[in-house]
């Protein structure tokens, strides 16, 4: 689960992390008062969407002006003017895709006099089963570009969960950022604070880009992006309360109600598969034959007829879907359950696109019989390669 920047900063502030003063705004009419509540005289008006690249992004609407999603204002009146332009407008960034995202919230933040910019993040390293730090002197830019062009400017290290954060970890961060004296002490303190927040709130990723040194000699978190482990949300109701469903795909929200692993993609072939590995292989072979998947959907190994039917409805609700491929290898998952779920869903919502079904494994003959006797227009497939070729051909009208 992701949260907005202003929510992330408020959470980090509870752990003593140095952040600038700011006020979230939902209505343009409140923007000027929000600015006047801050020290000023310079303010930053930040679009709050779940996507990066806001500063370099562009709004679709001409009425929003030609500036990006993060704007510098020199007065409270200018803050108000920016708010009127930005709220309700559609911001397109490198991470939103061409459709963009509507800006429904702004964060009015006190301006900072910046001397240096750094990059600092924490994430769960699945290879070491530890929390890892990624640190770089190159802040305010895409860390992927830094990793590609100047990897020597990135320092990484992990923290042993048995010992937790220790003094030498903070010194490693300070050294990586080439900080000394009081700034080094601030970096050591910040390292401990961030680790404490990360572990206490079951985060999966915490990215600060940039972490800045102000001209007054203070470290400050200028931007923060936080993701949480969905499997741990049950013990963090205060975090779950921060969820903004308007920032999420409606189909993904619906899928989560049935414990389905669903991710919207930008292709035209809907996929229903059991098992993440088989799902990825299915998407790969669709690409191999010249088309792209419309989604990743893993129904899991213990899906019921109702769960399968719900999954099928979610796929058909996507207007971009021009064909559907069901690819099931029944181990724990039984092929007859898949067949019953698919046929029930088709009877309820109808079927206006080609459907190719490949079943193999437990109760496969019974599953094929259910589909055959349903009278539905389903194209059977013998194996994955055959299934991929058939759905691509059907969608292309071959």
UniProtKB/Swiss-Prot annotation:
Gene3D superfamilies named in the record: ATP-grasp fold, A domain, ATP-grasp fold, B domain, Succinyl-CoA synthetase domains
Cofactor list: Mg(2+)
UniProt-listed InterPro entries: ATP-grasp, ATP-grasp_succ-CoA_synth-type, ATP_grasp_subdomain_1, SUCC_ACL_C, Succ_CoA_ligase-like_bsu, Succinyl-CoA_synth-like
Entry's EC annotation: 6.2.1.5
Pathway involvement of the protein, from the record: Carbohydrate metabolism; tricarboxylic acid cycle; succinate from succinyl-CoA (ligase route): step 1/1
Coiled coil: none
Binding site for substrate: 274, 331-333
Residues that hold Mg(2+) according to the record: 209, 223
GO CC, any one term: succinate-CoA ligase complex
Textual note on the cofactor: Binds 1 Mg(2+) ion per subunit.
Pfam family membership, one: ATP-grasp_2
Binding residues annotated for ATP, in chain numbering: 46, 53-55, 109, 112, 117
The ATP-grasp domain, residue ranges: 9-254
MF GO annotations: ATP binding; magnesium ion binding; succinate-CoA ligase (ADP-forming) activity; succinate-CoA ligase (GDP-forming) activity
GO biological process terms held by the UniProt record: succinyl-CoA metabolic process; tricarboxylic acid cycle
Keyword terms, alphabetized: ATP-binding, Ligase, Magnesium, Metal-binding, Nucleotide-binding, Tricarboxylic acid cycle
Catalytic activity, reaction form: succinate + ATP + CoA = succinyl-CoA + ADP + phosphate; GTP + succinate + CoA = succinyl-CoA + GDP + phosphate
Subunit structure, interactors included: Heterotetramer of two alpha and two beta subunits.
Family: Belongs to the succinate/malate CoA ligase beta subunit family.
Chain's role: Succinyl-CoA synthetase functions in the citric acid cycle (TCA), coupling the hydrolysis of succinyl-CoA to the synthesis of either ATP or GTP and thus represents the only step of substrate-level phosphorylation in the TCA. The beta subunit provides nucleotide specificity of the enzyme and binds the substrate succinate, while the binding sites for coenzyme A and phosphate are found in the alpha subunit.
HAMAP family xref list: Succ_CoA_beta (MF_00558)
Protein's name according to its UniProt entry: Succinate--CoA ligase [ADP-forming] subunit beta
Species: Bradyrhizobium diazoefficiens (strain JCM 10833 / BCRC 13528 / IAM 13628 / NBRC 14792 / USDA 110)
Gene giving rise to this polypeptide: sucC
């Amino acid at each position: 689960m992701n949260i907005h920047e202003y929510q992330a900063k408020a959470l980090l502030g509870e752990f003593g992390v140095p952040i600038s003063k700011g006020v979230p705004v939902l209505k343009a009419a409140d923007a000027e008062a929000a600015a006047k509540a801050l020290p000023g005289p310079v303010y930053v008006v930040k679009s709050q969407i779940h996507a990066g690249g806001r500063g370099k992004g562009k709004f679709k609407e001409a009425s929003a002006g030609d500036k990006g999603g993060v704007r510098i204002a020199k007065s409270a009146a200018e803050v108000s003017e920016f708010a009127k332009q930005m709220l309700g407008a559609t911001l397109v960034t490198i991470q939103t895709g061409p459709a963009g995202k509507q800006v429904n919230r702004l964060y009015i933040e006190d301006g900072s006099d910046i001397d240096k910019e750094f990059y600092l993040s924490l994430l769960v390293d699945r290879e070491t089963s530890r929390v890892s730090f990624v640190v770089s002197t190159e802040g305010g830019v895409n860390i992927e570009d830094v990793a590609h062009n100047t990897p020597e400017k990135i320092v990484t290290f992990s923290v042993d969960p048995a010992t937790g954060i220790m003094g030498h970890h903070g010194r490693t961060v300070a050294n990586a950022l080439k900080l000394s004296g009081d700034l080094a002490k601030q970096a050591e303190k910040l390292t401990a604070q961030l680790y404490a927040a990360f572990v206490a709130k079951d985060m999966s990723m915490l990215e600060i880009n940039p972490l800045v040194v102000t001209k007054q000699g203070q470290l400050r978190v200028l931007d923060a992006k936080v993701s949480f482990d969905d499997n741990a949300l049950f013990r963090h109701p205060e975090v779950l309360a921060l969820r903004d469903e308007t920032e999420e795909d409606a189909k993904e929200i619906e899928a989560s109600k049935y414990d389905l692993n669903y991710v919207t993609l930008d292709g035209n072939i809907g996929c229903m598969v059991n098992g993440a590995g088989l799902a990825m292989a299915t998407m790969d072979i669709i690409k191999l034959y010249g088309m792209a998947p419309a989604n990743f959907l893993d129904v899991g190994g213990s899906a019921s007829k109702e769960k399968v039917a719900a999954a099928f409805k979610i796929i058909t609700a996507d207007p971009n879907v021009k064909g559907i491929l069901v690819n099931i290898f029944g181990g724990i998952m039984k092929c007859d359950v898949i067949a019953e779920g698919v046929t029930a869903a088709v009877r309820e919502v109808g079927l206006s696109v080609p459907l190719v079904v490949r079943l193999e494994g437990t109760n496969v003959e019974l599953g094929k019989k259910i589909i055959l006797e349903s009278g539905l227009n389903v194209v059977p497939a013998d194996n994955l390669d055959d299934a991929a070729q058939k759905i691509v051909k059907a969608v292309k009208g071959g």
